[in-house]
């Protein structure tokens, strides 16, 4: 497949009117690169683990960071801004993750989609963690869904890519969704050149699309197994995983996410830092390819903090749990 065919294949997968593939390090960088969030616009975002990307990536925009990712928080941050769905603007943007932020929050995308239209806001969803397999933001009310394709490419892409998908604007009974039509007009007018993707890179993405469902189900299933192990482990605390009833968004997540609750789990160490745990583990947990087959750990609050974010691979969760258990027990004796 060439780039055009890959974009068409992703559009079919995402239920999108149109898709643009970009080379970008992450979703906020891709949104900035698109050029559709323009000077004078207001961008309201829940991204407490990605604040720098928003504060530095949108020059001339009024960037407002909110917490929690609730309708009330977004509405309050939008007060006094006279937004329009005309292509000329000015535009009000609401940005959330389908799964994201500290605690792996799952916003109520349906409620946000309805409220965004009432406020003349354009709802943008970073769907990277859940993926197109695990969430359908465009169906739920987003006008734009962006997804970093590391996991789609099984960690094998030589560059980082993001897919930007715009919602269809045609509703039932020949009605037009003004918000989606506005987003499409902005994307059409952004003047972004078609991505130059060599055949080897295109092949990685094509093969990833072909195997996506099976691999993502494996990631989701292993994340659930590891979350249940961690929730029962007395050596860690505050396990955050949308599939656990203890998660603050568990009820919402059951109606927003599909095929499970995503590939990610967060937890806190007890009287240990993330750096100490990393030193006790093999380097593979930190250096394995993002989105690849091996389970990967990161420290979203830094190595001096106690928070660990785990992205389940397709490896054996019993082996991963055993390695983690041994490392934690060893550290407890020091």
Each model region followed by its residue ranges:
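Conserved PLP-enzyme active-site core in the AAT-like
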Residues: 5-233
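Positively charged, small/polar-rich N-terminal and surface patches that mediate targeting and assembly
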Residues: 1-3
């Amino acid at each position: 497949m060439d780039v055009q065919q890959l974009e068409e294949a992703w559009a079919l997968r995402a239920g999108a009117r149109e898709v643009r593939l970009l080379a970008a390090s992450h979703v906020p960088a891709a949104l900035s690169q698109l050029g559709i969030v323009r000077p004078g616009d207001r961008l309201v975002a829940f991204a407490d683990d990605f604040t720098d990307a928003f504060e530095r990536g949108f020059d001339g925009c009024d960037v407002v960071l909110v917490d929690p990712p609730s309708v009330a928080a977004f509405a309050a941050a939008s007060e006094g801004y006279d937004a329009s769905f005309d292509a000329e603007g000015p535009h009000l943007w609401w940005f959330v993750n389908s799964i994201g932020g500290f605690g792996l929050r799952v916003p109520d995308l349906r409620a946000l989609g309805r409220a965004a239209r009432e406020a003349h806001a354009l709802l943008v969803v970073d769907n990277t963690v859940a993926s197109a397999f695990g969430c359908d933001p465009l169906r739920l009310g987003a006008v734009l869904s962006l997804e970093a394709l590391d996991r789609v490419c099984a960690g094998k892409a030589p560059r980082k890519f993001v897919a930007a998908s715009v919602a269809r604007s045609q509703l039932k009974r020949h009605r037009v969704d003004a918000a989606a039509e506005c987003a499409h007009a902005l994307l059409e007018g952004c003047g972004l050149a078609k991505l130059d993707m060599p055949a080897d890179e295109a092949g990685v993405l094509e093969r990833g699309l072909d195997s996506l469902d099976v691999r993502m189900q494996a990631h989701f299933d292993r994340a659930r197994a590891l979350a249940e192990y961690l929730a029962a482990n007395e050596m860690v605390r505050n396990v955050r995983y949308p599939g656990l009833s203890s998660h603050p968004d568990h009820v919402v997540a059951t109606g927003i996410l599909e095929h499970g609750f995503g590939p990610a789990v967060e937890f806190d160490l007890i009287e240990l830092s993330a750096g100490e745990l990393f030193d006790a583990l093999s380097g593979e947990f930190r250096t394995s390819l993002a989105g690849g087959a091996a389970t990967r750990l990161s420290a979203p609050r830094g190595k001096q903090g106690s928070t660990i974010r785990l992205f389940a691979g397709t490896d054996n969760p019993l082996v991963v749990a055993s390695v983690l258990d041994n490392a934690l027990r060893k550290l407890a004796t020091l």
